[in-house]
Design a protein with these regions (language model features):
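A generic structural signal for ordered alpha-helices
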Residues: 31, 72, 83, 98-99, ...
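Transmembrane alpha-helix detector for multi-pass membrane proteins
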Residues: 54-70, 79-153, 173-183
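Membrane-interface segments at loop-to-transmembrane junctions
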Residues: 33-49, 77-92, 116-136, 156-165, ...
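Terminal module of membrane-associated proteins
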Residues: 29-47, 106-108, 113, 211-229
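Binding/recognition "hotspot" determinant
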Residues: 5-17, 122-124, 149-816
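Membrane-anchoring hydrophobic segments
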Residues: 1-95
């Protein structure tokens, strides 16, 4: 080691060793590179072989056709040079198209997909349309190459090959146009979701079929995993686009609408999926100690562990995952302060809201609508308070939010209208096995209870060769399931009514008067739809209870009592709130009323209808709650109508203008008169006392108010001489009168007696005896001109003797004598 030769040899040895290692490393790297490329090369070779085989087959068939035509008709082959020129030209076109298309795809990928998540990039690379177009162009080039080889070896070609070549050339050009359009579409990253939407559509249809695959639990679980994976990719697409600028939110909305369409399709097919299918996910649910069993509590205490959660079927996992994507997109709209997109999304929800009611998803959908309301309310209210161009859009958003609850009730009514209890239960008695049950037509059979029932029936048939279970027991079991679903419907209707009313009430409390009036106007609509629901339910419930023969099987009581109570509470609170916001809004928009909704008219007409309805029901508390604020509303509405109709100065319109302008107070007098008559008939002075106290309070507020009463008396006196004919509200007023006439005639207190000449109402009331004592031939009272009762009994005491109101018939002379 001390010699120089040793170190020289060592130096060269290390150098040689380094060169050998470097060479080995280089060779290894190249081998690994070739190994990695080999997979691509294998794929290329496979594709090439397939293209060559298909092109050879096509060329062979065309050559055979050419040979047949030339032999059959003794034709000469085409000139080889012409075929070569056309083929080379076509190859050149295809090559240019392929190069341009690949460059276009590469530019789109680098601009839009270079930093996307892996799943999105893979979707772009696997786009069916793009790959199909490239495959057709490559196949055309291979086919042209084979044609050139045929020309080179001197094969005779004729029209069949030429026509095929021209057809394929045209197809390449058309393919490029489609591919170019697809490139434009793929520049929007939402468009790559189309293939996943198609896959999810197919999955939903497949899992709802009763075939070999969907009855197998392995395939049920497989479909769920495939759908969950596809939804996760949709979520990635939505999340990736959270940073797009506001002007591209419209594209995001289209993506959300596709999700809603998928959810709607799923709900229409969900009833076909068996309740125990592994398609439905399982969800852990924490237990409460006070609800746990003895054994569970003992194990937890002995081991020091908490009570183990229980797994339950998560039947809403699919729609829940889809709506989470939409919820994230809505939050993006709100972050951008884009209330117009929120409004459009609420419009898109209307169709699926009706579907939810129709396909037994109502309670779940109400919770979703409430969540949308909760997150969007701050932004909507901010635009309501700002007098900007988005204020009308915010009002429309409130309108559409309430419309969704109404659409839900419409869907529920459609479902209720299709329930034929007798036919449905009779059909259930014809089934002898669970697999025979048509759970799509009768979704009430899709439960654990019904499955056990039909398994037992099938066992009876297998063992005893005869069904032992009686028909009444089958009907009772199915009726029990329908009974439970009716209870859910009642809960949903109650929640929907309360939600709409709460929206209006909260907006009114926060001084958004126009928005509150908009929301409260929907309360009347939804109450009307709910009355239809109640009518259906109250027809169905007794029929179901008749099927409950075995009383040892307890049914949880279902009734509409709480629903009626909720409706009554809302009807009592609604008028006062609606009057406040409608009056406030009308005063603020008095001058530009033509550009605003007539909420004051809406309020007046609905309040009037509510008063008539309360008289019909003999509900003094409701009448009192509404009537105490009614006169102020009438005075404002009278002036509102008068200032609008006096614009018509034509002489021939004078009678019509007067009739319309004086209608509000005439109707107030009519309703007040009907209330007095009803109180007299029921022998309850509270009705008349209320009418008199409201009028007295008005007179005592200002001495000048007596002058207003004089003017009203003169106007009503003039209306008696009106020869207009049928006015625009005369039929409505007559209808109110007839409803009270009918209520009196149908009341148990209604009695008649005969005098020497006619049948008369039996009563101790002098007012009724003089005003409507005579009974008509059809056995009912006549309350025509009921406004006279109010004017004579209540108003005349505040009028001078020479201006007192007089009826047409003069019945007041006998009454006052």
């Amino acid at each position: 080691m001390n010699r120089k030769l040793y170190w020289v040899i060592r130096k060269y040895w290390r150098k040689c060793d380094f060169y050998i290692k470097r060479l080995t490393y280089t060779i290894r790297e190249k081998l690994e590179l070739h190994h990695n490329l080999a997979q691509v090369q294998v794929k290329i070779v496979k594709t090439m072989i397939l293209q060559i085989c298909s092109s050879l087959l096509l060329a062979f068939l065309l050559a055979k056709c050419d040979g047949f035509l030339m032999d059959r008709f003794s034709l000469k082959p085409l000139l080889t040079d012409i075929v070569k020129d056309i083929t080379i030209g076509g190859m050149g076109i295809a090559g240019v198209i392929l190069g341009l298309y690949c460059a276009n795809i590469a530019s789109i990928f680098s601009a839009k997909y270079s930093n996307v998540p892996q799943n999105l990039a893979r979707l772009f690379q696997q786009d069916i349309v793009t790959n199909s177009c490239i495959k057709q162009i490559v196949g055309y080039i291979v086919f042209c190459t084979i044609i050139l080889l045929e020309c080179a070896v001197g094969l005779n070609l004729y029209l069949t090959t030429m026509i095929g070549l021209l057809f394929l050339t045209i197809r390449v050009v058309v393919t490029f146009s489609l591919a170019g359009n697809r490139s434009y579409v793929l520049s929007d990253t939402f468009s790559i979701a189309d293939i996943k939407f198609r896959d999810l559509y197919n999955t939903v249809k497949n899992v709802s079929k009763h075939d070999l695959f969907t009855t197998d639990q392995s395939f049920q679980n497989h479909y769920r995993k495939v759908a969950a994976n596809d939804i996760s990719i949709l979520r990635e697409i939505g999340h990736y686009n959270m940073c797009i600028p506001r002007n591209q939110n419209r594209t995001m909305l289209l993506f959300m609408e596709k999700i809603l369409a998928l959810g709607e399709l799923y709900w229409e097919n969900k009833s076909k999926i068996p309740f125990d299918s592994l398609w439905f996910d399982k969800k852990a649910q924490y237990q409460q100690w006070h609800l746990a069993s003895d054994s569970e509590i003992r194990i937890a205490l002995n081991t020091g562990t908490p009570i183990q959660p229980k797994e339950r079927k998560h039947t809403h996992w699919f729609e829940e995952e889809l709506l989470k994507i939409n919820q994230e997109c809505v939050e993006k709209f709100l972050k951008d302060d884009d209330v117009s997109m929120v409004q459009r999304y609420l419009i898109s929800l209307c169709t699926i809201s009706q579907t939810a009611g129709e396909w037994n998803q109502d309670l779940y959908w109400i919770h979703y609508l409430e969540s949308v309301e909760a997150i969007s309310k701050p932004v909507i209210c901010r635009h309501l308070s700002n007098d900007d161009i988005d204020q009308e859009i915010a009002l429309s958003a409130v309108d559409m939010l309430c419309s969704n609850f109404t659409s839900l009730i419409v869907g529920i009514n459609r479902r209720l209208s299709q329930i034929d209890i007798e036919e449905l239960l009779q059909l259930c008695t014809t089934y002898s096995d669970w697999n025979q049950c048509d759970i799509q037509s009768i979704p009430y059979l899709n439960t654990e209870t019904c499955r056990k029932l039909y398994i037992q029936i099938n066992a009876e048939l297998s063992i005893e060769k005869i069904r032992i279970t009686p028909d009444w027991y089958i009907k009772q079991t199915v009726a029990s399931e329908i009974y439970k679903s009716i209870g859910t419907i009642i809960d949903s209707i109650t929640a929907a009514i309360k939600s709409v009313f709460d929206i209006g009430q909260q907006l009114q409390n926060e001084k958004y008067e126009q928005a509150a009036a908009t929301a409260l106007s929907h309360v009347f609509e939804i109450l009307n739809k709910c009355r239809i629901s109640i009518r259906y339910i109250e027809e169905i419930l007794p029929r179901l209870k008749d099927k409950h023969i075995e009383n040892s099987i307890i049914w949880v009581e279902v009734s509409t009592a709480l629903l009626h109570k909720e409706i009554k509470q809302i009807e009592e609170k609604l008028p006062a709130i609606l009057i406040k916001c409608s009056v406030h809004y009308a005063v603020d928009h008095w001058k530009n009323r033509e550009d605003s909704p007539d909420f004051l008219g809406l309020c007046y007409n609905h309040i009037s209808e509510a008063l008539i309805r309360s008289i019909e029901r003999d509900d003094f508390q409701e009448f009192q709650e509404i009537y105490k604020d009614y006169f102020g509303l009438v005075l404002l509405y009278q002036e509102y109508v008068r200032t609008d109709v006096i614009k018509h100065k034509e002489e021939h319109m004078a009678g019509i203008v007067f009739h319309v302008a004086t209608a509000p107070f005439a109707e107030y007098a009519l309703i007040s008169g009907l209330a007095i008559i009803w109180g007299e008939f029921k022998e309850e002075n509270c009705w008349k006392d209320l009418v008199d106290s409201v009028l007295q309070r008005f007179v005592e507020q200002d001495e000048g108010n007596k002058r207003i009463l004089q003017i009203f008396a003169q106007q009503l006196q003039a209306r008696q001489r009106d020869i207009l004919g049928i006015g625009n509200r005369d039929i409505l007023q007559t209808g109110w009168t007839q409803r009270i006439e009918h209520s009196i005639s149908e009341s148990p207190k209604f009695e008649t007696e005969y005098d020497h000449f006619s049948e008369r109402l039996k009563t101790d009331s002098k007012l009724l005896s003089e005003f409507c004592g005579s009974i008509l031939f059809h056995g009912s009272v006549e309350l025509h001109d009921s406004e006279d009762v109010y004017m004579i009994v209540s108003v005349n005491k505040y009028l001078p003797d020479d201006q007192k109101y007089q009826s047409r018939s003069g019945w007041e002379r006998d009454y006052e004598s």
